[in-house]
C-alpha cells in the first residue's frame, strides 16, 4: 500500500511501487488532466507537483510520492480561478492544448519561486515544457500577466 495525498485528498492505493505516478493519477484516481506525452521526461506534458516541486510523472515511480502531497492540474483550481489559468485564457494560449496542464504546473512553481520573473527566468523555467504548436510567446505573456495578477492580490 502506498499512501499519499492528491490535491489535498488522501489516497491509499495497492499498486506496484514502481508504477509511474502518471498512470496512478490517470488510471487509479481518474484525474485525466495530466497528460502522457513522451514517456521519457522530455516534453513536460505530465508535469505535476510533489511537495511543491515540478516533477515529470511519466518517469517518477508512485513510491516517490509516498507520504507526500501531489498536486495535479485539477488541484491548481477546479473553477479556473487560479491567476495562471485566467491569464492563459485571457492571452488565448492554447491551440491544441495538449501540453497546457504541464506548462501551467511548471509556471506555477516558477511564480512561487520568482513572483516577478524576467523573460530569461521564464525561458529557463519553461525549457523542459515543449509546445509543438509553438505558443511560446503567448505562454511568456500569460506568465507575466499572472505575475501581475498575483502582485495585485489575485492569488488564491
Question: For the regions a protein language model found, what residue spans apply to each?
Answer:
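Signature of N-terminal electron-transfer/Fe-S-associated modules in redox systems
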Residues: 1-156
Amino acid at each position: 500500500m502506498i499512501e499519499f495525498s492528491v490535491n489535498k485528498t488522501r489516497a491509499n492505493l495497492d499498486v506496484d511501487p514502481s508504477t509511474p505516478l502518471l498512470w496512478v493519477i490517470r488510471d487509479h484516481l481518474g484525474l485525466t488532466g495530466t497528460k502522457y506525452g513522451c514517456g521519457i521526461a522530455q516534453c513536460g506534458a505530465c508535469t505535476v507537483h510533489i511537495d511543491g516541486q515540478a516533477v515529470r510523472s511519466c518517469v517518477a515511480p508512485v513510491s516517490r510520492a509516498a507520504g507526500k502531497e501531489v498536486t495535479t492540474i485539477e488541484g491548481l483550481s477546479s473553477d479556473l480561478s487560479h491567476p495562471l489559468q485566467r491569464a492563459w485564457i485571457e492571452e488565448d494560449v492554447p491551440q491544441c492544448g495538449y501540453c497546457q496542464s504541464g506548462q501551467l504546473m511548471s509556471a506555477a512553481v516558477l511564480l512561487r519561486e520568482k513572483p516577478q520573473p524576467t523573460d530569461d527566468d521564464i525561458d529557463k523555467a519553461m525549457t523542459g515544457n515543449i509546445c509543438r504548436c509553438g505558443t511560446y510567446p503567448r505562454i511568456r505573456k500569460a506568465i507575466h500577466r499572472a505575475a501581475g495578477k498575483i502582485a495585485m492580490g489575485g492569488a488564491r
